[in-house]
Amino acid sequence: METEEKNEECIYIPDTQEQIDERLALAWEGIEGMSDQQDTSEKYKDYFMKQAQFCLMIREHAGAVANGSIRQMSLNELRLMNNELYSDITPDHYDTSYTNPVYTSNLFGKELGQLLSFLAAETRAMISSAYQGDKIGIVIRLELLLEIYGIFRDAAQDDIEIKAKYVKSAMYWYVSDYAEYGALHSTVSQVNTDDEFVYKLIMESDLSDIRYLFYTGEYISKGIEHTAAHIAELPTDKVDLMADTFTEGFKNGFKMMNKDITKVKSVNIRGQFGFERFYVRAVKNFEKMGFKVAMSTNANSIFAGYELERSCIYGANPNKQYDFDHREDLALFLDGRLVTRKLEGIRASFEEHREQAAVYGGPAVLLIFGEKDFEPVSSGEIPAYNDEQKKLSASYTSKATAAVYDYVVSSHRCFTIISFPSPEIGVQYKEIFDEIVKINSLESAKYAVIQQSIIDALDQGIYAEVKGKDGNKTDLKIMLHELKDPAHQSNFENCVADVNIPVGEVFTSPVLEGTNGVLNVKKVFINGLEYRDLLINVKEGMAVDYDCSNFSDHAVDRKLIDDNIMFHHGILPMGEFAIGTNTIAYVAARKFDIESKLDILIAEKTGPHFAFGDTCYSRDEDNKTWNPDGKELIARSNSISDLRKSEPDKAYFGCHTDITIPYDELGSIEAVRADGSRITIIKDGRFVLPGTEELNKAFDAS
C-alpha cells in the first residue's frame, strides 16, 4: 500500500493539560474558519461545511457537559440534543449521509469517497469524547479533519486535481500515530478501574429520573428508555435475583475452572444502558467480594472498530448498516507496518496499566437480544480487505490477543455472561422478560445430574455422530479424545449456570483428525446477523468450505461468512462440540415465536452446537479442571492449540463462533463405541437416553 513517507517520529500524546488546551484552541479556530469560508472546490464545499458544523455542535455539547448546564435541561431538551447527534446516520437519513461510503463514492468517486466517508465516521467518535471530557479524543480528530481540509483547499487554490494518495497518507499516519490512544480507549479500558465516568454516572445518579441516560453521550432510543422504565418498576427481589445470578455465576466460574479467585482485584462489567438498577446491585455484590469494577463506554472508531456488539457499556445502535459499512475501514490503510504499530500500541498502553491488568479477573457481560432483524446490504463501495490484508488482519487478531495475555493472567481470569430481551422483541416484552429471568435462574444442581447421564454415555464413545432431518443436511462424525483412565477422566464439561448463563449444555474440544462431514442450519442468527441455509463442510476437523443463501450472488454469501464466522482465516478448526439441554428455553422460544431472536447464550442450550475457531479453553489448556463428579476434563486442547509452545503464532485464531442446530431439525445424536455399538442420546428431536427423561417434559407440556 502506497503511503507518503514520514520523516518525523510518531506524534505522542502531549503530557501536559496546557499543551492539549493549546492544540484544542488552535483546532477550534481552524474549524471556525472552515465553517465561515470555504476555500475548496465547489464539489467538496458541502462536505467540509457539514463536517465543520458537526464539530461546532460537538463543542456546544462539550461545553454543556463541562459547565453542568446539561443537567438543568428538561427531558425533551435532552432528547432533542441526543437526536441531533445521531440523526445523520439513522436509516431515515443515512442514504444521503457523508458517512455512507456508497453515497460518497457516487459523489466523489470510489477512492476519495471511501476515504471521506471514513473521515466523517471518525469525526463522529468525538461524541463520546465530548461527554467524557476527553480533550485528546477531540483534538486529534479535529486536527485530522483540518489536515485533510488543507489538502483540498491547497488543491483548489493551485487549481490541481486532488490526489487520493496524499489524503490516504494523512489518514494512515493518524491511525499509526495514535495507536496507543486507540488501545487505551478500547482494549485496555476493560482493566482500567481509574476511569470512573460510567461508574459514577450509574452509582450516583437518581435512577428514577431517566435524564441520567442522556448524560452518557450514547444514542438513547425509545427502547432503552422503555428498558430503564421496566427495570425501575420490577420488585427489588427480582432485580436482586437477576444480579445475584450474574455475580454468583462469575464467582462460581472460578471454582468450576479451578482458578484462584483470591488473586483477583477487579472485574469489568459490560452491557447496554437501561439496566442501571441491575448494575448497581451487581457492582455492590462484586465490591463485597473485594473487587473494583471497571465500566467504560467507548465510541466506535477506527481504533475500537465497528462491532455490532460492543465490549463496554453502550447505548442503542442508531443504524447497524452504518457499522456494517465501516467494519473494515482499516482496509483503506492496513499493511504490515501498521500491524506492527498497532501491536506496539497495545503493548505500550498495557505497560501503563500493567498492575491493573495483573489482577484483572475478567468480564461480566450482559447481552441484549430481540432487536429488529438486520440484513446487511452489501456493496462494492464498502471498504473491504484484499486477500493480503485478510491474512494481515487474521495475524493481527491472533497476535493482539497474545499481547493482551502477556499482561492479563489467564490462570486467574474468568467470565460470566447473561442475556435479557429488548423491548423490540414485541408486544409480549414483559412476559418474555419474566420468562427469561426464570430460565436464567433454573436450578443448576438438577441439570448437573441429568447432564452427567449424557456425559457418561458420550465418554463410552470413540466418536459422536450427529445427523439432521426434514431437510437439514447435517451429517457429522466428531472424534473424541481417548480416555486412558475412564474412572477418573472425562471428555465433556458439565456446564451449569456459571460462566454461560443459563444452565444447559455439555461440551468438549473434539479431536480434529477424523472429524468430518457437513454442518447445516436452515436459519440461524449469529452475532446479530441472520444466515439462511448455512452450510459448512468439515474435513479433518477444519471448516474448509462454506456457503449460505442470503444473497443471489454466492460470492457475496461466502464473503458474509468469511467476514463474520471465518474472520478471514480461510480455514478454521472445530473448537467445540456441545449438546444443549435447556428444553424449557427451547419451548419458551417457540411459545413466544422468538427462536430467531434468541441470544447465542440461550440458543446454544437449545440443541447441539459447534464452534469454529479456538477451543473453550483457549490459552488456558494447561490449567487442570474437573467436573462435579471429580473426573478430570482432559479434552482441553487439539492438534492446533497443541502448537502453543512450539509455534504459538499458529496455535490460536482469536475467534470462537457458535452455530446451533435446533431440536426440530435434529435427526439423531449417538455415541459410537470402539466395537461399533451405539448409544442414542437424541432421536427425532427428543432425548431418549435413560436419565434424561425430565428434559422431554417441557416438550410434552407445550
Short names for language-model regions:
Residues 2-513, 683-702:
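Active-site bordering "gate/hinge" segments
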Residues 459, 527-530, 570, 603:
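Short solvent-exposed loop/turn micro-motifs enriched in small/polar/acidic residues
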Residues 466-472, 523-526, 671-675:
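Short acidic, glycine-rich loop/turn motifs
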Residues 497-535:
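Conserved AWS/pre-SET-to-SET junction and N-terminal core of the SET lysine methyltransferase domain
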Residues 531-548:
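Active-site and channel-lining beta-strand-loop segments
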Residues 545-621:
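Dual-mode signal for accessory low-complexity, basic/Gly-rich regions
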Residues 606, 612, 620-626, 636-646:
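Glycine-anchored, exposed beta-strand/edge motif detector
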Residues 629-702:
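Extended hydrophobic packing segments that form well-structured cores
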